[in-house]
From Swiss-Prot:
NCBIfam families: rpmF_bact (TIGR01031). Belongs to the bacterial ribosomal protein bL32 family. The keyword Ribosomal protein applies. It comes from the Bacteria. This is Large ribosomal subunit protein bL32. SUPFAM superfamilies: Zn-binding ribosomal proteins. The keyword Ribonucleoprotein applies. GO terms for cellular component: large ribosomal subunit. One of its GO terms (biological process) is translation. It holds the Pfam family Ribosomal_L32p. InterPro entries: Ribosomal_bL32 (IPR002677), Ribosomal_bL32_bact (IPR044957), Ribosomal_zn-bd (IPR011332).
Length: 59
């Protein structure tokens, strides 16, 4: 069984756990519709992504 050679210091433990916290999702205002959407995601209202229509929107 593997056993640690040295004790992990509280600073090292804290640095390891720093990424464990949940972060609030980021939203940006869409240039075309003005709706809020996630970055690098399709705007579901218009079906546009990076200036191109990639999704046919149902009315």
């Amino acid at each position: 069984m593997a056993v640690p050679k040295r004790k992990t210091s509280p600073a090292k433990r804290g640095m390891r756990r720093s990424a464990d916290a949940l972060k609030a999702p980021t939203y940006i205002e869409d240039k075309n519709s003005g709706e809020l959407r996630r970055p690098h995601h399709i705007d579901l209202k218009t079906g546009m992504y990076r200036g191109r229509s990639v999704l046919v929107v149902k009315d």
